[in-house]
């Protein structure tokens, strides 16, 4: 930050007016970690907390990282030791006095959260966030499209490295009613199709047996890859820029897991 003395807690307070922490799942780590009263120099915004992202923050003199996904810290406990798989990264964060803000399911479940942001970027109309399942947003396209067409739009808008869909539905060209669940949402598929009579559900992270299940139920699903959630970076960047104006010194990090497909 340049002109104003802004604390990490100030930024959290601003963001949580739109993305209420009370909406977060009980198992999820949302909120501010490490030093809430730290005066912020610069801010790094990312999808995940990785070594590359932390290095970017250090390079940019950023002492606050805002991420969608919490720092991965699987813990194995016994009577003698607590072992965190990311202990080296945690130590690097502490050494460089970097605070963290995570907005995961608190962001996803908000009225203008992940699925709603995705639906708007795809140009869906008559948008509705489901009252029973806040992660589900349903909308419509003015003109019917094919799976192939909407997949290409998703890849362009969300920077998804790979899009998957069942070839059974490839020839259908009048798909209009679409449900979106950002992240891993296949477990909600049955409910979404049954209550909304969807032509298509767009989500991520389907496993082999999920595809078998979806085909047996004649459910048309697009797997847009979890990296599609990288739109979080732009959303938070824009929100902070509008609020803080020239006082904000914001940086973006997109850390992509490099997986080869043969």
Swiss-Prot record:
Pfam families: DUF34_NIF3. GO terms for molecular function: metal ion binding. The keyword Metal-binding applies. One of its GO terms (cellular component) is cytoplasm. SUPFAM superfamilies: NIF3 (NGG1p interacting factor 3)-like. Keywords: Metal-binding. A divalent metal cation 1 binds at residues 68, 108, 229. A divalent metal cation 2 binds at residues 69, 226, 229. Homohexamer. Belongs to the GTP cyclohydrolase I type 2/NIF3 family. This is GTP cyclohydrolase 1 type 2 homolog. It comes from Ureaplasma parvum serovar 3 (strain ATCC 700970).
